[in-house]
C-alpha cells in the first residue's frame, strides 16, 4: 500500500453556528439528504455540521483537487460501520473517479472538542 493523498481540515464550531443562524444554505451545500436527517436528530447540530464539513474538506484536499471539476460535497457521505468507525460512501460519479485514480482504500478520522472539529483523510493505492 502507498499513500495516494492526505488531507486535514479544522473548523471552528462558532462559525458554523453563525452560518446556521443565517439560514440553511451551508447545510444544503455540504450535507446529503441522509446526513441532513442525521443532523436534525443530533444533540448539537452545529457540531455535527462542523464535523461533516471538516471531513469533506479533508477528503477534497486528499483528492488534490478541492471541490470542483464535477465533484461536490453531495458526492461524498460520511457513514459509520457497525463499530462506529467513520467511513466514506461515494456516489457513482465520485466512486468512478476514485477508481480511475487507482485509489484502493481510504481512512477517515474525525474529532471534536467544544470549539473545534478536525478531520484527517488518507487515501491509499495498491
From Swiss-Prot:
Name of the molecule in the record: Holo-[acyl-carrier-protein] synthase
Gene3D superfamilies given in the database record: 4'-phosphopantetheinyl transferase domain (3.90.470.20)
Cofactor: Mg(2+)
GO cellular component: cytoplasm
Pfam families in alphabetical order: ACPS
Catalytic activity: apo-[ACP] + CoA = holo-[ACP] + adenosine 3',5'-bisphosphate + H(+)
Top-level lineage group: Bacteria
Entry-linked InterPro entries: 4-PPantetheinyl_Trfase_dom, 4-PPantetheinyl_Trfase_dom_sf, ACPS, Ppantetheine-prot_Trfase_dom
Binding of Mg(2+), residues: 9, 57
Entry similarity comment: Belongs to the P-Pant transferase superfamily. AcpS family.
Protein purpose: Transfers the 4'-phosphopantetheine moiety from coenzyme A to a Ser of acyl-carrier-protein.
Alphabetic keyword roster: Cytoplasm, Fatty acid biosynthesis, Fatty acid metabolism, Lipid biosynthesis, Lipid metabolism, Magnesium, Metal-binding, Transferase
Keyword tRNA-binding among record annotations: no
Known EC number: 2.7.8.7
Keyword Isomerase found: no
Compartments where located: Cytoplasm
Amino acid at each position: 500500500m502507498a499513500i495516494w493523498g492526505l488531507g486535514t481540515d479544522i473548523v471552528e464550531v462558532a462559525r458554523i453556528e453563525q452560518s446556521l443562524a443565517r439560514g440553511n444554505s451551508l447545510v444544503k451545500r455540504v450535507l446529503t439528504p441522509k446526513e441532513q436527517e442525521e443532523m436534525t436528530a443530533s444533540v448539537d447540530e452545529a457540531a455535527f455540521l462542523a464535523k461533516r464539513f471538516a471531513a469533506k474538506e479533508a477528503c477534497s484536499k486528499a483528492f488534490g483537487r478541492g471541490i470542483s471539476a464535477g465533484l461536490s460535497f453531495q458526492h461524498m457521505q460520511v457513514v459509520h460501520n457497525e463499530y462506529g468507525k467513520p467511513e466514506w460512501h461515494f456516489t457513482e460519479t465520485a466512486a468512478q473517479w476514485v477508481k480511475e485514480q487507482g485509489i484502493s482504500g481510504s481512512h477517515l478520522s474525525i474529532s471534536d472538542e467544544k470549539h473545534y472539529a478536525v478531520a484527517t483523510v488518507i487515501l491509499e493505492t495498491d
